Amino acid sequence: MNQKYSLQNPKSSWRLIPLLRVSGQLQMAIDQWLLEQHQTGKHPPVLRFYTWASPTISLGYHQRRWPTSWQQLTWQETPVELVRRPTGGRAVLHQGDLTYMVVTSGLTGKRLDAYQAICEFLIQGWRSLGVELHYGSAGREYAHNPSCFGTATGADLLSADGYKLIGSAQLQRGNTILQHGSIRLSRDTTLFTQVFGEPAPPPVELPIKQEGDALFQTVIQALTEAACCCFGIELVTQPLSDAEWQEILAQPSLERRYSNN
């Protein structure tokens, strides 16, 4: 990792929030709240992982065009939730994936440098699991593709055979950064085709012979260990408290802020 953009600080402690499974609207509210708390100096840097309570399509903050049919989609008789991320990028179908989130500060340089400084722990963590990743290089066609996983930019991570495993998006507020991304572990290919009108990308071949929660925990363990090593930090596990939940749920216009409207 380029030292200019290094996150390493031997005396730094980050908060690790245990795996959380709630609605997409609440996940976006939590990410936004953590960003604002860190920006105002009330909260340390944080790493967390989460899954989605039901299949969800998350739109990029500036994404204004998407099929109207997305608002009536169902999967196994469950409505597909449609939410808006605080970060940019294209639409992501969250179903069978694991999402990571980092909130930190102190990175300088161009946005891509910040992406790659944070993504280093993803590269190292997956390497420890036997998967080599490299960055994508999509051109202008990215802006015309409604699906985040339809192309790969310099902020995305691909497997050795060229298939996108992790799609990331970022929001910078002054010196503070929120970066989160979808790690494609398993997915219903029929639902992907229903959403985007095209075949699902081929699955990334993983050497890990696990599924479901066991797979999630194996990946989380590898990535948390890599984060400690790459960033030179100590991770302190701390779930969200009742008081913090109250603050998150009390955010003004929570439903309007993170809905697709």
Region annotations inferred by a language model:
Residues 7-73, 84-85, 148, 158, ...:
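Active-site loop/lid in soluble adenylation, ligation, and acyl-transfer enzymes
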Residues 61, 102-106, 159, 185:
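Short beta-strand-to-loop capping motifs
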Residues 49-51, 65-110:
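A glycine-rich, hydrophobic loop/mini-helix early in the fold
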Residues 109, 120-141, 172-261:
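Long, positively charged amphipathic alpha-helical accessory segments at protein N-termini or as interdomain linkers
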Residues 95-154:
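Internal, conserved structured core segments that host functional sites
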Residues 151-158, 162-170:
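Aromatic/basic-lined ligand-recognition segments
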